[in-house]
Amino acid sequence: MALSTNNNSSHVGADDFLELENILSSEYNEEGIFKTSKTVCIRTDKRIGVGFLTPNDMISRLVGFINRKAEDAGVRSVESFRQISDVVLIIVPQIALPAELSLKLVDSANILEAVNDQEVTVNSTGGPCVVVMNCAHSIPNEDRTHVNGSEVHRRLGIQYQVDCDNISGRVTTFSITALWREAFSFRPSFYKVSDPLVVPISVGFRKAVIAKSHADLQRSIGRGLIVTHHSSESSVTSESPIDLTVKKSTGLKIRDKSEDDNQRKHPVPLTSSNNKLKTLRVSTTPIVNGRSTSTSE
């Protein structure tokens, strides 16, 4: 936003009305800026990129615009600041290849350096994780910087860099959900902060649904095998052929046909240990008046 100023006064120009029109528009959009819709899913589909955090709703953007213009015009006698803290990034890998993601919390005044060493590196092989960053200073609302040739108010953002081999083009390597806190204050703030915190997210194993149904599994195997023009003769190789048998108690089991032949040739005798039938014993002692009496003479 271009702004003509001198020591005594400042005026509102055409660029100011253009910025206000964009803020009031429901289709508010700035190239390289993370809007509310983008905070749902930030896709790292480039090798390197940066996106700046904006207020979450149009009212906050409008209030910030009014505060900045009031300061520029000399209406306010005090400065105002935006305090951004507790930047939470939920990172989920989107490829099944090793990829390294480097993140920095940056200021639009200098997007090359991390703010207070707030930088971290995660790997896709580690699975999803949560990265928590913080900011140790507030940003004056009057400050302006240039983004893509346009003058906008100074803001914080997330810079990412992806290092991954064997991929080309615009491939999404990670998806990032960004959340943060933003507060308005008339006083500047400065806090000491700790290093970024990385919290891994434990996930369960995905089991094939078709493996739970033996009938569906058999049908899938049948559809996946070409059995036409095949003879039913036994295999002539030294390896014994295998077949798929379904057992209600044990489920799907791969059995060797030689085991069945061996059981037919050498049947296992039925012993008391493997006999499942139980003998019902009947007592012959009569019961008289609730007491048992012996029948022996």
From Swiss-Prot:
**Database matches in InterPro entries:** MPV
The places in or outside the cell where this protein is found are:
Host cell junction, Host plasmodesma
Q: What are the Basic and acidic residues biased-composition ranges? A: 253-264
Region annotation (Disordered) maps to 249-297
Polar residues biased stretches? 270-297
**Chain segments annotated as coiled-coil in the UniProt record:** none
Q: Does the keyword Isomerase apply?
A: no
The protein's superkingdom reads Viruses
What name does this protein carry? Putative movement protein
According to its UniProt entry, this protein's organism is: Citrus leprosis virus C (isolate Citrus sinesis/Brazil/Cordeiropolis/2003) (CiLV-C)
Q: Which gene encodes it?
A: MP
